[in-house]
Structures are given as C-alpha cells and as structure tokens.
C-alpha cells in the first residue's frame, strides 16, 4: 500500500527540493508525494485522494490567492483525520496561534529542518501502518 503526502507550495523549486530530500523513500515506495501549487488545487487533490491513504498535508502559509491559513480549516473539514503541518518564513506568535487553533499539528519555519520534518513523516507512516 502506498501512502500519500500532499505538499502545498506556490514555489516550483519546492517539488525539486522535496523529491531530492526524500528520494530514497520515494524510490523504495515508502510513500508518494503529490504537489499542489495553490489552495484550490490542494482542496481538489484532497477531495480526490481516495485511491491511496493520505497521511499528511504540508502547506506553505504565504501563497497568493488562498493562503495556507485559509486552506487549513477547509482541508481539516474535508479530512479531519489527516495531520497538517504548516511551513512559514516568519514564525510570529499570531501566525502560530492561528495555525494551531485551526488544527495544524505543527508549524515549521524556513529554511526547513528536514530532520524534524522526517521525524514527523516517520510518525505519520507508523500510524498508517
């Protein structure tokens, strides 16, 4: 069974970076990653993620159109069972409060600490097993 992680970010280099950082996991089939470049695209993918178990959503906060903070409650309404980790350049107290109040599991700052992110992913994979 292949597990799905959805990464939501408007910057195209995010996909290249994540595929590089998690290449062994992806090659081994431990999980797959899909990439959405906007909030509406992410919501469509979340709604359609029925073929494989969606185990984690990683979302940037600062995106044009629908921000990650606007996406978060809508994603949780569609899939309350799926943890969401928010990613931001600026970790202000207000941003963190809003993210956690709306159901985010965690808030990571850029540049991303991939050791911390890997630990979060490992927990999600273990829970899904």
For each feature predicted by the language model, list its residue ranges:
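Two-component/phosphorelay signaling modules centered on CheY-like receiver
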Residues: 12-34
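Alpha4 helix (beta4-alpha4-beta5 surface) of REC/receiver domains from two-component response regulators
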Residues: 15, 70, 91-106, 119
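Short amphipathic alpha-helix used as the core "switch/output" element in two-component signaling
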Residues: 44-47, 69-81, 101
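A Lys-centered signature of the CheY-like receiver
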Residues: 110
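Active-site T/S-Asp motif of two-component receiver
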Residues: 58-60
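Receiver (REC) domain active-site loop signature in two-component systems and cognate sites
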Residues: 63
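Acidic, metal-coordinating helix/loop segments flanking the phosphotransfer/catalytic sites
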Residues: 19, 35-56, 77
């Amino acid at each position: 069974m292949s597990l799905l992680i959805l990464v939501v970010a408007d910057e195209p280099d995010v996909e290249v970076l994540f595929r590089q950082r998690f290449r062994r996991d992806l090659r081994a089939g431990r999980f797959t990653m899909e990439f959405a470049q906007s909030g509406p695209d992410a919501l469509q993918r979340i709604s359609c993620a029925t073929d494989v178990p969606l185990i984690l959503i990683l979302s940037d906060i600062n995106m044009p159109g629908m921000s990650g903070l606007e996406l978060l409650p809508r994603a949780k309404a569609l899939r309350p069972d799926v943890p969401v980790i928010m990613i931001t350049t600026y970790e202000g107290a207000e941003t963190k409060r809003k993210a956690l109040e709306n159901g985010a599991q965690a808030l990571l700052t850029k540049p991303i600490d991939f050791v911390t992110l890997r630990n979060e992913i490992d927990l999600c994979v273990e829970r899904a097993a």
